[in-house]
Amino acid sequence: MTDTPNSPSKSTTKSASSSTKVIDSLHSKIDELTDELTALKQSHQELTKKHSITAKKNDSFVDQLANAKHENDMLSALLKRKERRILDLEDQFNELTSQNESLVLSNKNMKIRCENLQSNSNANIAEFERLKISYDALIASQMEYKNHYQQELNSLQTAFDNYKLENTRRFEELQTSIVSNDKDIDTLLDSLTNKRKAMDNIYVNKNNKVLQLLGNLAHLAKLHGQDTKSQVEQNVSVIEQLLAKHPDLQEKILEKEKIEVDLAEIIAHSNDVLANSSFDEDTTLINSPDLENNQNFNTTHSTSGSATPNSNSHSLQSKKRKNYKRNSLILKESPPIISENVPSSLPKKPQVNNNLINIPKARSKFNTPPTTPRQFTNHNNDFEVTHQWNGNNNINNHRRNNSVDSRSDNSQHRRNNSYDSRSDHGQHRRQPSQQNNNYNNNNYNNNNNNNNNNSNNGFVKRSGSVRNVNNYNNNNGNANNNGNNHGNKSKRRSTYNNNNNNNSKRNSQLFDNNFVLNV
């Protein structure tokens, strides 16, 4: 069958051939693209390998760069140190150079000085030779002077011997004239008697004032003891309230303050002190026994209820130390919280003190008060009260200058107007009487300062009550040596002086010389 242009078979054949071409072309393109993809994959793999190798090289280069930078910094620091070292060495070199130059200059100066000293030495040797010659000549002249003055001394010795003989004769004449002047001496003795009486009255007034001050002190001590007792009672009540409110108070104190406190012992100690302390009775003064028999009273007095202040204090304190701790506190590695001036414990019940305390008779001849308060060792006493009574220390400093016995010049200035016509001004009196007067002066001067309270002057220690009162005992000793002779005005001075050793008492002993405070 013939194909026509418009026949369906022809068109089908054309379309089949064109699709085959397209398929072939597509297959060829696919093959080309497959080949190209394969080539690209291979190139990509190669580039990936090259990239990894390049990255590793880059990392190694970065590490090398960091190492090089670090090495560069180290080298820069080392270079700076080297430069500083060079500068230091240059400074040292310059300093050593300057020292060398100064040493060279000093060496030159020392050489010049040595030359000058050598020249001076030569000049001194020549001067020494010249002075030696002059010294020999001077020795010869001095020997001549010595012989001359020796002769003059011999003549002066002869004149001095003659002068001594003349003065001896004159002294004997004066001695005879003194015998005729005993009436003046008797008049002076009468005047001295009146002055002694006036002085005794002054002593009595002073002692009464001291008694009044002591009474005031005892009253103040009582008030202070009562106040202290009330404070202790308040403290005990406060501690008991705290214990009732906080039973574990002791553990808390130990935990917070690092201090072990025995509160039960503190309360027991305080209650014992409160039970044994009493300040309700008044303080009174009692008289002492006879003063002539109390010389060794402190060592022999052993009546019941009395003891010496020291033994009483030590016995009480020894009992306290045995039964109680000092502050009832055990401090463990903590700073001190209690001042040394705070009393360690409260006083026990005061004892009746009938002891009589004697002040030693050895008194200072200078009637001056102490410049500073005396300090006493606190033998575990609970309280220490220091008062200084300066008002009574200077009584004996105001004696009239015409008084004979209170001066240290040993009667060299007795009524100089009676002997103004003589060149010795009344100093050369009859020797035996003068010796007696010297003894009287020494005896009186050793005892006229006995009201200074120089045994613990004006200080009172107390523990709960006034217990140690040996500070106010005035020992008048042998001051009144004229007790039996003033009534007879016609007796001579020798008779008056023969009674210097009598232990008669002066009127100021109304103070009783020794007293105690009875609580």
Curated annotation (Swiss-Prot):
Return the Low complexity bias intervals: 7-21, 436-457, 468-487, 495-508
Q: From the Swiss-Prot or TrEMBL record, what is one GO molecular function term? A: mRNA binding
Q: What membrane topology term does the record carry? A: Peripheral membrane protein
Q: What keywords is this UniProt entry annotated with? A: Coiled coil, Endoplasmic reticulum, Membrane, mRNA transport, RNA-binding, Transport
Q: Which domain of life is it from?
A: Eukaryota
| Function, in words | RNA-binding protein that binds specific mRNAs including the ASH1 mRNA, coding for a repressor of the HO endonuclease. Part of the mRNA localization machinery that restricts accumulation of certain proteins to the bud and in the daughter cell. Required for the delivery of cortical endoplasmic reticulum into the emerging bud.
Q: Which family does it belong to?
A: Belongs to the SHE3 family.
Q: What is this protein called?
A: SWI5-dependent HO expression protein 3
